[in-house]
């Protein structure tokens, strides 16, 4: 996430290098690996959640030098040895301390239970405990935790009090004023003109806070809601709570679309004011560190600097009835159409209404957009260049809903889906699954339509499968060169959601083609996000034994536990490793609770290949959690847990 807050501070006078000298006396810091006198000579990194019985399973030994005669033993919960083997060949060095990473093949371990790995020989090390369990059991809990994160993100009156002691918030959103598009300077740091009211009042209360802040975006909410609905359609593993949370997201999107005036609203709240430090006449959401209900308690009048923090502005995608940026039109239409598919059997009346809204939104798509798509204000919060994938997604889901409801427009929508798929394949904005690219979801569902011999489409099922393969080949090529087999780029933002996106795409590819070639790659990507990485941390809060305790998230910091136990932001997915050089400056507010309580960064000893990780409340670069991050992870876990996702023999 690139929503930079004001008030940055340095880590220490000596930066990251200085923190490394201090961490070896810190035994209570998260991820410290019980460092006492210096870095351990070797560590074992493993997926701390675990593996399904039939998956390929790898752990990693990271040591100060390659070892050729080391062995490993796997022990069960009673300490009995159940598996042994030799340490594999080195996959490469990591940093100046750890010059070798070697694989430990655990694939023969298939009996459900709790296990740990011990390495003996020239170096010794022991892994955290991990589990072997059926896919539905293993990933079902992770899905439920992801849903809990969304419960903690709720805004408005319908909050979940057991999630971080949440209280109703931003109730003034029930009577919100609509403003014209805000004007920012060239660097998108400050407003250059007062906001101009153009409409309202309208009710935009509810929904989810976008990340660790309190802004709400149609761009991210539609992606997250569509992902939850896709997951709900895929497997019952998420249960009633997943369905309820998906409906919560859809209900807010319904408020953001005025079907009568044909107006799509895209944002609630102001992310940047008229100064970069919050000292001006117009202050923004990012200028204070507080609980969301504190905004409701503000006593303000028009013209007060904090007026727009309580009485939050609403911005439109376009004036009423005018063409809408196609990325938004396609994605929001897809979300309503997914809901229509789920409602078709039990609530056909509501399903027809949802499909009509999808069709109305889709019909307003501006298919000759300018250089900048509408995502957020300022645009730099969520830059995006791809839109043909969104149009394919919208048409595909409308066609599937049309099939379920026997709608006469189904063939036309199928044709449009094929058209936009072809345009996407010919574009120069090809990406992989995540907030900025939904082609993998669109391709997988369009392939289902083509399986039904849909006439008149401009693409073939094989072309769609080839593009899924293209996305996976990009990641698997990187993984083949990475010591921990990471397919994501961990020197830039969104490394963890990117890894989850690759894992989900591999599952979709298997479903479309029946080809299990990328199954092991998918498992490796999930393993990396859950602890089988250089830092030995899971990047899903509450998953595994070591995970972020100090996310940059205001309710988690101000109302939650800071030691990883009790009331935490369970299920939230963080950005994960980023370029180490980006961690020199952290966010700071006087009202932040200090986290961690000890000085230094115990993870710095494990930085390498340009990547760094820090668990610090001010480290938005690595531990800010976000709705879209978590939605992508939930989608990946769902596809892994689904009964139709056949486990393959690791041999």
Where are the regions a protein language model picked out?
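N-terminal export and membrane-targeting signals
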Residues: 1-15
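Short coil/linker segments at helix-helix boundaries
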Residues: 230-248, 270-274, 312-320, 338-354
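Carboxylate/His-rich catalytic cores and anion/metal-binding grooves
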Residues: 242-263, 267-270
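Aromatic-lined, polymer-binding surfaces characteristic
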Residues: 329, 333-343, 351-402, 424, ...
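C-terminal region of N-terminal signal peptides and the immediate post-cleavage residues
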Residues: 3-5, 19-37
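Short beta-strand edge segments in extracellular beta-sheet folds
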Residues: 130-135
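Short, compositionally biased P/S/T/A/G/V-rich stretches that sit at domain boundaries
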Residues: 38-49
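Aromatic (Trp/Tyr) and acidic
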Residues: 48-123, 136, 146-222, 230-231, ...
């Amino acid at each position: 996430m690139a929503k930079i807050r004001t008030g940055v501070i340095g880590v220490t006078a000596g930066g990251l290098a200085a923190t490394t000298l201090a961490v070896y006396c810190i035994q209570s810091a998260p991820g410290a690996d019980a460092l006492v006198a210096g870095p351990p000579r070797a560590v074992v990194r493993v997926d701390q959640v675990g593996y399904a019985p039939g998956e390929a399973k790898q752990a990693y030994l990271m040591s100060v030098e390659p070892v050729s005669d080391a062995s490993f033993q796997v022990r069960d919960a009673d300490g009995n040895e159940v598996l042994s083997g030799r340490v594999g060949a080195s996959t490469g060095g990591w940093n100046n301390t750890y010059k070798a990473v070697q694989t430990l093949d655990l694939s023969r371990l298939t009996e459900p239970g709790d296990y740990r790995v011990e390495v003996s020989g020239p170096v010794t090390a022991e892994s955290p405990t991990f589990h072997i369990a059926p896919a539905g059991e293993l990933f079902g809990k992770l899905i439920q935790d992801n849903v809990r994160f969304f419960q903690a993100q709720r805004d408005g009156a319908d909050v979940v009090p057991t999630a971080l002691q949440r209280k109703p918030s931003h109730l003034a959103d029930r009577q919100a004023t609509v403003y014209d598009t805000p004007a920012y300077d060239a660097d998108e740091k400050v407003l250059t003109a007062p906001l101009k009211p153009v409409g309202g009042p309208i009710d935009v209360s509810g929904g989810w806070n976008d990340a660790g802040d309190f802004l709400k975006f149609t761009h991210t909410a539609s992606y997250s809601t569509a992902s939850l609905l896709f997951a709900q359609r895929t497997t019952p593993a998420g249960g009633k709570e997943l369905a309820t949370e998906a409906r919560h997201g859809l209900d807010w999107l319904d408020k953001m679309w005025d079907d009568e005036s044909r107006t799509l609203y895209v944002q609630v709240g102001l992310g940047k004011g008229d100064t970069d430090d919050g000292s001006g006449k117009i202050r923004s959401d990012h200028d204070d560190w507080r609980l969301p209900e504190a905004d409701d308690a503000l006593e303000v009048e028009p013209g007060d600097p904090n007026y727009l923090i309580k009485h939050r502005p609403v911005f439109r995608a376009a004036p009423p009835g005018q063409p809408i940026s196609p990325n938004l039109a396609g994605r929001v239409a897809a979300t309503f159409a997914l809901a229509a598919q789920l409602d078709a059997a039990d609530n056909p009346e509501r399903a027809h209404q949802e499909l009509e809204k999808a069709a109305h939104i889709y019909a307003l798509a501006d298919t000759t957009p300018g250089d900048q798509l509408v995502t957020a204000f300022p645009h730099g919060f969520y830059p995006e260049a791809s839109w043909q994938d969104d149009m394919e997604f919208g048409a595909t889901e409308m066609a599937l809903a049309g099939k379920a409801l026997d709608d006469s427009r189904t063939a036309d929508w199928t044709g449009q889906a094929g058209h936009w798929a072809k345009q996407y394949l010919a574009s120069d904005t090809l990406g992989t699954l995540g907030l900025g690219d939904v082609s993998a979801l669109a391709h997988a569902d369009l392939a289902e339509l083509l399986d039904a011999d849909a006439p008149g489409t401009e693409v073939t099922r094989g072309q769609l499968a080839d593009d899924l393969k293209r996305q996976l080949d990009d990641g698997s090529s990187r993984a083949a060169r990475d010591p921990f087999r990471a397919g994501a780029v961990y020197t830039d933002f969104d490394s963890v959601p990117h890894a989850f996106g690759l894992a989900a795409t591999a599952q979709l590819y298997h479903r479309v083609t029946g080809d299990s070639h990328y199954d092991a790659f998918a498992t490796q990507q999930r393993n990396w996000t859950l602890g089988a990485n250089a830092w030995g941390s899971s990047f899903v809060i509450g998953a595994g034994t070591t995970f972020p305790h100090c996310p940059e998230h205001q309710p988690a910091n101000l109302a939650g536990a800071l030691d990883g136990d009790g009331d935490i932001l369970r299920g939230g997915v963080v950005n994960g490793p980023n370029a180490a050089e980006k961690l020199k400056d952290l966010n700071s507010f006087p009202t932040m609770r200090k986290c961690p309580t000890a000085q230094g960064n115990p993870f710095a000893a494990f930085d390498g290949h340009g990547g760094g990780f820090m668990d610090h409340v001010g480290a938005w670069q690595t531990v800010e959690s976000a709705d879209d991050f978590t939605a992508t992870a939930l989608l990946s876990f769902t596809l892994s847990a689904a009964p139709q996702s056949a486990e393959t023999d690791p041999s």
